[in-house]
């Protein structure tokens, strides 16, 4: 069973499949907020991601399990006013004897999901064409307001903030390998497709 040490933004070592199926249940039950975490990491993707602001810093994700705790380097992204087009999540886990089992959770490709305030703790975040409004690079993490307590207060941070409400942070083809994702306002979806598979689940 996983555990979380205080002072760390942690990815608790639970099966990725259970995390993703639990996410589907959380959506169906209309939870006000949701936190997803997996020691193995899970894929988060969207064909288009927009936000009114983004704070990006460096920290650690602490994975704790029966064998002890391990810190993994991670990027920490705090985004506000976030909207995802074609939101997709994919997770995979290895079950003894059975082998690999994966699950893909996705909206329709054209659906725009308003996820509001988001904290993403990830091994990697990639995107294609990226538009950033007023941007400060090299600001101290404490001054930028990066949420992770594992970040060095005097360490590197990048901030980008909309000045007019229309000049948004805009990431095309965003794809992240996430350890943890917190959705402060929960989700309202116009469609939802949960697909378990015995092959490798991906958002591609």
Stretches with model-predicted labels:
Residues 1-65:
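Hydrophobic membrane-targeting and insertion signals
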Residues 4, 9, 24-26, 32, ...:
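Compositionally biased, intrinsically disordered low-complexity regions
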Residues 5, 20-22, 66, 79, ...:
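Intrinsically disordered, low-complexity segments enriched in small/polar residues
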Residues 48-128:
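Extracytoplasmic beta-rich ectodomain segments of secreted or membrane-anchored proteins
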Residues 111-182, 190:
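Acidic, glycine-rich flexible loop segments
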Residues 188-204:
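Short, low-complexity, Pro/Ser/Thr/Gly-rich segments in the mature regions of secreted, periplasmic
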